Design a protein with these regions (language model features):
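Proteins enriched for Cys/Gly/acidic motifs involved in redox and nucleic-acid/cofactor modification
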Residues: 1-131, 169, 184
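Conserved SAM/AdoMet-binding glycine-rich loop
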Residues: 1, 10-11, 116-184
């Protein structure tokens, strides 16, 4: 049994004690799943743990790229993870860690691969998409403008946005891009 993601990240001690769980994988180690499964079977069933405290260690964006998704024309591309808001009612910053933005070039490479595979629409997503770039000096608007230039992509959608990012300038710039699906 594999336990992965937010549960392990926020309830790691509880998960470690659960006899039914064989492999623990935190939110920033999902790419290591196959490696951890191999280690589990090579270790003759000994528990395998891959969890780091994502709130106290600087973490890079975990690249999980997509080349195709069944027989669809729309692809979801995660460009941001984590949150720095620490709202009193929310566990996300503890479960997902601080804001981490994906490198613009890596996003563009994935979008180009998807377009070459026949995808016509991309949805840019993130845990707190409005915070894209605050950790690396980029902006969500710049990323959207770059994705807009990719040949073969006909529609661009945005995951949920927080209202604070939707300034008059932001809305005006989006309105100039014919590939942006109407959100406002």
């Amino acid at each position: 049994v594999v336990a992965a993601g937010c549960y392990v990240q926020t309830k790691g001690d509880e998960a470690k004690c659960d006899e039914a769980i064989d492999i623990l994988i935190g939110n920033n180690q999902k790419k290591e799943l196959v490696e951890r499964l191999d280690a589990f079977f090579a270790g003759r069933g000994e528990k395998v743990e891959a969890v780091v405290d994502i709130n106290h260690e600087k973490q890079a964006f975990e690249e999980l790229t997509l080349d195709h998704a069944a027989e669809h024309t729309r692809a979801f591309i995660k460009v941001q993870d984590g949150c720095n808001q620490f709202c009193s009612y929310c566990i996300i910053p503890y479960a997902r860690g601080r804001v981490r933005s994906r490198n613009v070039q890596n996003v563009l490479e994935e979008v180009k691969r998807l377009a070459a595979s026949g995808y016509q629409e991309v949805v840019l997503t993130g845990i707190h998409l409005s915070s894209y770039g605050i950790d690396c000096g980029e902006s969500l608007l710049h990323l959207i403008q770059m994705v807009h230039q990719v040949e073969g992509i006909r529609r661009i959608r945005l995951g949920s946005l927080e209202p604070r990012i939707v300034t008059e300038t932001f809305a005006e710039e989006l309105a100039k891009m014919e590939k942006i699906c109407p959100h406002f």
